[in-house]
Amino acid sequence: MADQLTEEQIAEFKEAFSLFDKDGDGTITTKELGTVMRSLGQNPTEAELQDMINEVDADGNGTIDFPEFLTMMARKMKDTDSEEEIREAFRVFDKDGNGFISAAELRHVMTNLGEKLTDEEVDEMIREADIDGDGQVNYEEFVKMMTSK
């Protein structure tokens, strides 16, 4: 399944993997998964975290390594995000609930994820998604961005 990913996607997932893998040992534990989920405003229980790991933990060692992570991401991409998941993600970014994601809100979430972006990078991300050119991302634009492969 992971063999259907492009080089670029694999590189992106490698970057995402290292955001999760806080201690850099090449595996993601339930603790590390929990940290990232919480930084995204989610509050999973220990059991839910364990389930998430078990779902992709091919060798059964209780952690996720990069190949397992790739499989998980490929699977997620195949059953493309449901409307509800996208709406949920939008809510995480839209801190003040005004229906738009501003550069400041985007920067805030990315920083929480441990992703230090320059103002230029944040502006570039907004520009890429901002179809109507108002300098922020509305829900429709967000959906387009999330569903365009």
Swiss-Prot record:
<feature type="binding site">
    <location>
        <position position="21"/>
    </location>
    <ligand>
        <name>Ca(2+) 1</name>
    </ligand>
</feature>
<protein>
    <recommendedName>
        <fullName>Calmodulin</fullName>
    </recommendedName>
</protein>
<feature type="binding site">
    <location>
        <position position="141"/>
    </location>
    <ligand>
        <name>Ca(2+) 4</name>
    </ligand>
</feature>
<dbReference type="Pfam" id="PF13499">
    <property type="entry name" value="EF-hand_7"/>
</dbReference>
<feature type="binding site">
    <location>
        <position position="59"/>
    </location>
    <ligand>
        <name>Ca(2+) 2</name>
    </ligand>
</feature>
<feature type="modified residue" description="N-acetylalanine">
    <location>
        <position position="2"/>
    </location>
</feature>
<feature type="binding site">
    <location>
        <position position="130"/>
    </location>
    <ligand>
        <name>Ca(2+) 4</name>
    </ligand>
</feature>
<dbReference type="InterPro" id="IPR050230">
    <property type="entry name" value="CALM/Myosin/TropC-like"/>
</dbReference>
<feature type="binding site">
    <location>
        <position position="136"/>
    </location>
    <ligand>
        <name>Ca(2+) 4</name>
    </ligand>
</feature>
<feature type="domain" description="EF-hand 3">
    <location>
        <begin position="81"/>
        <end position="116"/>
    </location>
</feature>
<feature type="binding site">
    <location>
        <position position="98"/>
    </location>
    <ligand>
        <name>Ca(2+) 3</name>
    </ligand>
</feature>
<feature type="binding site">
    <location>
        <position position="132"/>
    </location>
    <ligand>
        <name>Ca(2+) 4</name>
    </ligand>
</feature>
<feature type="domain" description="EF-hand 1">
    <location>
        <begin position="8"/>
        <end position="43"/>
    </location>
</feature>
<keyword id="KW-0479">Metal-binding</keyword>
<dbReference type="InterPro" id="IPR011992">
    <property type="entry name" value="EF-hand-dom_pair"/>
</dbReference>
<dbReference type="InterPro" id="IPR018247">
    <property type="entry name" value="EF_Hand_1_Ca_BS"/>
</dbReference>
<keyword id="KW-0488">Methylation</keyword>
<comment type="similarity">
    <text>Belongs to the calmodulin family.</text>
</comment>
<feature type="binding site">
    <location>
        <position position="25"/>
    </location>
    <ligand>
        <name>Ca(2+) 1</name>
    </ligand>
</feature>
<feature type="binding site">
    <location>
        <position position="68"/>
    </location>
    <ligand>
        <name>Ca(2+) 2</name>
    </ligand>
</feature>
<keyword id="KW-0106">Calcium</keyword>
<feature type="binding site">
    <location>
        <position position="63"/>
    </location>
    <ligand>
        <name>Ca(2+) 2</name>
    </ligand>
</feature>
<dbReference type="InterPro" id="IPR002048">
    <property type="entry name" value="EF_hand_dom"/>
</dbReference>
<feature type="binding site">
    <location>
        <position position="32"/>
    </location>
    <ligand>
        <name>Ca(2+) 1</name>
    </ligand>
</feature>
<feature type="binding site">
    <location>
        <position position="23"/>
    </location>
    <ligand>
        <name>Ca(2+) 1</name>
    </ligand>
</feature>
<feature type="binding site">
    <location>
        <position position="94"/>
    </location>
    <ligand>
        <name>Ca(2+) 3</name>
    </ligand>
</feature>
<dbReference type="GO" id="GO:0016460">
    <property type="term" value="C:myosin II complex"/>
</dbReference>
<feature type="binding site">
    <location>
        <position position="61"/>
    </location>
    <ligand>
        <name>Ca(2+) 2</name>
    </ligand>
</feature>
<feature type="binding site">
    <location>
        <position position="134"/>
    </location>
    <ligand>
        <name>Ca(2+) 4</name>
    </ligand>
</feature>
<keyword id="KW-0677">Repeat</keyword>
<feature type="binding site">
    <location>
        <position position="57"/>
    </location>
    <ligand>
        <name>Ca(2+) 2</name>
    </ligand>
</feature>
<feature type="modified residue" description="N6,N6,N6-trimethyllysine">
    <location>
        <position position="116"/>
    </location>
</feature>
<feature type="domain" description="EF-hand 4">
    <location>
        <begin position="117"/>
        <end position="149"/>
    </location>
</feature>
<feature type="domain" description="EF-hand 2">
    <location>
        <begin position="44"/>
        <end position="79"/>
    </location>
</feature>
<feature type="binding site">
    <location>
        <position position="27"/>
    </location>
    <ligand>
        <name>Ca(2+) 1</name>
    </ligand>
</feature>
<feature type="binding site">
    <location>
        <position position="96"/>
    </location>
    <ligand>
        <name>Ca(2+) 3</name>
    </ligand>
</feature>
<comment type="function">
    <text>Calmodulin mediates the control of a large number of enzymes, ion channels and other proteins by Ca(2+). Among the enzymes to be stimulated by the calmodulin-Ca(2+) complex are a number of protein kinases and phosphatases.</text>
</comment>
<dbReference type="GO" id="GO:0005509">
    <property type="term" value="F:calcium ion binding"/>
</dbReference>
<keyword id="KW-0007">Acetylation</keyword>
<feature type="binding site">
    <location>
        <position position="105"/>
    </location>
    <ligand>
        <name>Ca(2+) 3</name>
    </ligand>
</feature>
